[in-house]
Amino acid sequence: MHLNTLKPAEGAKKLAKRKGRGQGSGNGKMAGRGHKGQKSRSGGMPKIGFEGGQMPLQRRLPKVGFTSRKSAYAAEIRLDVLSSVDSDVIDLPALKAANLVSEKIKTVKVINSGEMKKAVKISGLKVTAGAKATIEAAGGSVEV
């Protein structure tokens, strides 16, 4: 066996249908497009969502909501995630160093979700009232 004698298995490489190349091919003349009409022409399909002149669904339904630009630079952190940070003082640089928030984040809010397992000092972060109570109950403190 040599590299120049290798061939694909029989039937492994199926030839593409050559449309519009004579009647003997079985796909000649109309090439499977039928007679006349928009869909028989080159580039002749109506745009996506077109409903034959009826007002399309995407225009009948009202616009709803928006994408908040605040979400690009603000983040929320749960209490159980904070317990995994090794630093005693938790601030924005400590969270970025622990890869809990991305580098583009500018403000972080600590929310009361999960359990606080150790006493930590939180500095320079927004904290909800419930989260503050849980942190102080665990022996930690909050500085704004």
UniProtKB/Swiss-Prot annotation:
A biological process term (GO) from this entry: translation
Superkingdom of the source species: Bacteria
GO MF terms, alphabetically ordered: rRNA binding; structural constituent of ribosome
Compositionally skewed regions (Gly residues) per UniProt: 22-31
Disulfide bond keyword on record: no
A GO cellular component annotation in the UniProt record: cytosolic large ribosomal subunit
UniProtKB keywords: Ribonucleoprotein, Ribosomal protein, RNA-binding, rRNA-binding
Pfam families associated with the record: Ribosomal_L27A
Keyword Ribosomal protein (UniProt): yes
Family the entry assigns: Belongs to the universal ribosomal protein uL15 family.
PANTHER family: 50S RIBOSOMAL PROTEIN L15, LARGE RIBOSOMAL SUBUNIT PROTEIN UL15M
Record note on quaternary structure: Part of the 50S ribosomal subunit.
Cited function: Binds to the 23S rRNA.
Name this polypeptide is given: Large ribosomal subunit protein uL15
Taxonomic source organism: Hydrogenovibrio crunogenus (strain DSM 25203 / XCL-2) (Thiomicrospira crunogena)
Gene name for this UniProt entry: rplO
